[in-house]
Amino acid sequence: MVRDISEAVQSALIAARNAGQKVRGTTSPNPAVGCAVFDANGIIATGGTEPPGGRHAERVALDQAASINPERLKGASLAVTLEPCNHTGRTGPCDEAIVAAGIAHVYYVHDDPNPQAAGGADYLRAHGVEVNQMDFPVEGLEPWLDSVRYGRVSVTAKFAATLDGFTAAPDGTSQWITGPETRQYVHFDRAMRDAIVVGTGTALADNPSLTARDRDGSLLPNQPRRIVVGTREVPEGNLTRLGYEQYATPEEAFAALYESGARDVLVEGGPTLMHSVFELDVVDRITAYVAPMLFGGGRGLLDGPLVDTIGDAKRYELYDAFSLGEDAVIELCRKDRND
């Protein structure tokens, strides 16, 4: 694993990461990989994984580079967020395409955990390509990696709360705890997910649309599947107008989502659903939007205790933290994710 990264390689890895981020939410069950082809004069082309059945990121970038200037490909370098695949599925092996293009150097971040696709790095080395695995953050791939690791959908629990941990005031009001910058960020985040999950309590109380919208209110190009968990009937409203899927339990919902190709799921439910999901021990990530206000009472994050003593607490580790307007965003991941 290489940690000392040159400026040129770092720029290419950033370009590759950005290319992968742009296609998040459109590629499952395949990973949202990004790729950049570059040489001493800079970035030649970038590419992201196409929807299932389409080209992998490496082929998109190589094809784009060839259309711009095929001569620059010979002896060029390639940065990619996931080890190039070494198998034939709906498309041919990416490692063979890299060798055929005349690429001399490959820099990749994550090993491919899928045994059917792994081995690309070894193939490239055997065919004279210099290959380096880089220590570089690629957040957009993490949910897919979690899904492969655990054999289920990757679950992110999202909530907006006050400093003292309440999601609604004592009278039930909750609009709006967070500011406009945070609310827009949530919509952009939704667009990168395969599905949004709420409980029937939220569906009945809030009449949510569960859409991903741009700043002007228009729908973003990618819309996640809308999932309702619970047995109560959802009345006529936004969800019945837009379309949704309903399952009796979180286990049933997650199993059906995984079987149908979803890999990255966002849970936005109230305290009952959140409690059930945490009890299942399937929450891989938490995104907490914390507003600079106090209620001193009201509706909490969960509808009851998860543990009896501090030694049994469900623990997560800090992944990232930043501000949006007046709010703080705290992102956490499972402590055992790298075990």
Where is each model-derived feature located?
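Helix-turn-helix
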Residues: 34
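Zn2+-dependent cytidine deaminase-like catalytic core
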Residues: 37-137, 278
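Proteins enriched for Cys/Gly/acidic motifs involved in redox and nucleic-acid/cofactor modification
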Residues: 25-29, 53-54, 121, 127, ...
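Short secondary-structure capping/turn micro-motifs that flank functional sites
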Residues: 114-115, 138-141, 205, 273-274
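Short, mixed-charge, low-aromatic patches
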Residues: 14-22, 80, 97-102, 138-145, ...
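Enzymes that bind and transform nitrogen-containing heteroaromatic metabolites
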Residues: 1-31, 45-46, 65, 90, ...
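Active-site beta-strand termini and strand-to-loop segments that position acidic
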Residues: 39-40, 149-150, 333-335
